[in-house]
Amino acid sequence: MDLAPRPLGRQHSKSQSAFAFDNTATSIAASTMKNELNHLASTVKDPLAKKAFQKEMDNFFSLFSRYLQEDARGSEINWDLVESPKPEQVVEYDTITEAGGLSRDYLNKLAVLKLNGGLGTTMGCVGPKSIIEVRDGNSFLDLSVRQIEHLNRKYNVNVPFVLMNSFNTDEATAKVIKKYEAHKIDILTFNQSRYPRVHKETLLPVPHTADSAIDEWYPPGHGDVFEALTNSGIIDTLIAQGKEYLFVSNIDNLGAVVDLNILNHMVETNAEYLMELTNKTKADVKGGTLIDYDGNVRLLEIAQVPPQHVEEFKSIKKFKYFNTNNLWFHLPSVKRVVNNHELSMEIIPNKKTIKHKGENINIIQLETAAGAAIRHFKNAHGVNVPRRRFLPVKTCSDLLLVKSDLYSINHGQVEMNPRRFGGTAPLVKLGAHFKKVADFSAHIPSIPKILELDHLTITGDVNIGRNVTLKGTVIIVASDANRIDIPNGSVLENCVITGNLNILEH
């Protein structure tokens, strides 16, 4: 039985007449959508561009049709078949064979891909998230380039650096990467697909022409990486260069660096697909996890879990790991599953309300996640890796950590300070005043020393002075209309600060 794709927790018991009605409605919706997509394609005049657009719309229609069928079928997972993964389905990093003398040979067969489709809007920035300054004047992109350059120089190899952009990030990224032209690194870029947003009520596409406004389209999640790699021709380019393996990760995960032991393990085990997982903490209980489903390895996301089993899903005892989205692919195998139409990843219906031509409209975006493809590859399994390989920067709370004395940069790689006790990062929660990078920088112009910090919470209008040290648990709360200025040189240890404290400059 297949792992069902969607918000799963509904029990369906339909009569034959209800099924017949649903099937008829599904057929009509599919037929109408097909006509609309054909109309969109007819608005493209250039023959080559039209062919590429038609291919994209065919892929979208396949996704849309599957969505309709699953919606009518009302399928859900059978929780009785869900088990913790077997030892061979998730291998411990400490047990895999260390890379030996063949490292250079294997590296010559490797390419590195960063998912670069996202904007920096959630952190208050304009343009691709990858160009946000992270540390010492370096952006996410800069750090990635430095890592690959060092790898190529150290082993005398040529590992290409590949960026999967979206239509939101492609133009800005093309301008930025020009500065690397003199560097010893081959940079390849391609775009993930551009799919039409769909009206929730009518199930019709929002755009009326292929060049309709940008807000009428969406990038369909990183599960699109397989088809986009193939359709763009990048996969053929890499294979022609002798590349067989691809390491894929989010560009904002500063821990996702090339690991020779994992590459060696992939080659030695003939794995077509590897997923890096790491141990859950209380902060990660909602993350997707690998399961044994009726004897097969599957990715399970919280949205797929029936409501009565959500707490069990969050259990660290039964499901110890979560997906870091550091993935390793065997390129010829990717080409095979795409060309044979074997991919059938779980669909994530992203329903939202957007502003369109001055009005609010309800839309659906059909997305997929690359981790869900694990069940389509041979010898695919997970590797439980150290936490250091998962260091995402999603918020300014994360940014404070990576800018601090907790970490240092070595050839583009972010490494934890060996003087940090326990080797884990403190828990940092910054309030709404710190949501945007510009506001964060204004309130904390100089990053405090946090080597001995366990927990930091700051809410309200709080300003941190220079050369401040934070230790233990520190909570600073400025209530409405109040402001707290932490003086230069302060040492705060295991304290709670509330109220109003203004420091006047003389």
From Swiss-Prot:
Residues at which substrate binds: G117, G118, H222, N250, I251, D252
Active site: K394
MF terms in GO: metal ion binding; UTP:glucose-1-phosphate uridylyltransferase activity
Residues involved in Mg(2+) binding: K129, D252
Catalytic activity: alpha-D-glucose 1-phosphate + UTP + H(+) = UDP-alpha-D-glucose + diphosphate
InterPro entries tied to this protein: Nucleotide-diphossugar_trans, UDPGP_fam, UDPGP_trans
Record: residues binding UTP: L115, N116, G117, G118, K129, Q192, G221, D252, K394
Pfam family, one: UDPGP
Subcellular location: Cytoplasm; Nucleus
Enzyme Commission code(s) on record: 2.7.7.9
Predominant cellular place of this UniProt entry's protein: cytoplasm
Function of the molecule: Plays a central role as a glucosyl donor in cellular metabolic pathways.
Subunit structure: Homooctamer.
Protein's recorded name: Probable UTP--glucose-1-phosphate uridylyltransferase
Originating organism: Schizosaccharomyces pombe (strain 972 / ATCC 24843) (Fission yeast)
